[in-house]
């Protein structure tokens, strides 16, 4: 039985907000030796969503791993969100997920085995929806619950979509609204309205598969998924990798209804402030202390795709998304490199 168990009460931080902050991570990775392998097509140099390794003529592996803490209290839903979050990295690269392995850190003394069974069932159902096969996994008994997956996908090397290839003149399109990290903080505090919780869960359990398929149809210049470093953090990675500036229009960036009310109540994850403090030197904004900016730094879990498309491709993408009932909004444009990596207007 899993009723009455509040998973979020067992962890310090929820979802992707539990990741290491960008400053500490960059420092830890700064001394890594670059791999000298001609088959490694995408490595860690531009902080892309997944690695890509060529295994034959016209075929490459897309490899990623993602582990999160609970950001909702229902075990099955947590498992489904965690799997959607891990799969997203493969979709963002333009790949097709084929296999996955569970990674479980479980407090066996604090939770019954039925909780783990429900988590794994949720993850498995998301994998099946994505057309991927679960091939195994690994467990560790831990004081804090964590669950994620290592996912492998396939891709043609000529169809890899990177985060460092945005071009000046491109339009920026976002495929999910922001605010799930803030909502998760409210869930942990028992202060999230039921309707807002349900809406956040709907977005977090939604796979990025259809949006990624449309991306390939329309020919995006670049793509990344918006996760733990927030929209601005991942936009900075795109800008620095491509040598451009990304301009975001604050009023055009979608935020879940009700999130700003939670911000006003102080229900903002520490990871949001960590992201803001780290990326502030690279961002031009009217006022960095404006609360309206906080959702742009909010750590997202299973967030949407941030796409960089030529004006004509963006038009096709938005029109096709509308026809197919997919969420997509133009949120900015790509400029030649300026004084900042991301300019918020």
From Swiss-Prot:
EC number from the UniProt entry: 2.7.9.3
Cofactor note: Binds 1 Mg(2+) ion per monomer.
Highest taxon of source: Bacteria
GO MF, any single term: magnesium ion binding
InterPro entries in the record: PurM-like_C_dom (IPR010918), PurM-like_C_sf (IPR036676), PurM-like_N (IPR016188), PurM-like_N_sf (IPR036921), SelD_I (IPR023061), SPS/SelD (IPR004536)
Keyword Cell division among record annotations: no
Site features described as Important for catalytic activity, chain residue numbers: 19
CDD domains with a match to the protein in the record: SelD (cd02195)
Keyword Nucleotide-binding assigned: yes
Residue numbers binding ATP: 19, 46-48, 66, 89, 137-139
A single Gene Ontology CC term: cytoplasm
Family stated for the protein in its record: Belongs to the selenophosphate synthase 1 family. Class I subfamily.
HAMAP family per record: SelD (MF_00625)
UniProt-recorded name of the protein: Selenide, water dikinase
Originating organism: Geobacter sulfurreducens (strain ATCC 51573 / DSM 12127 / PCA)
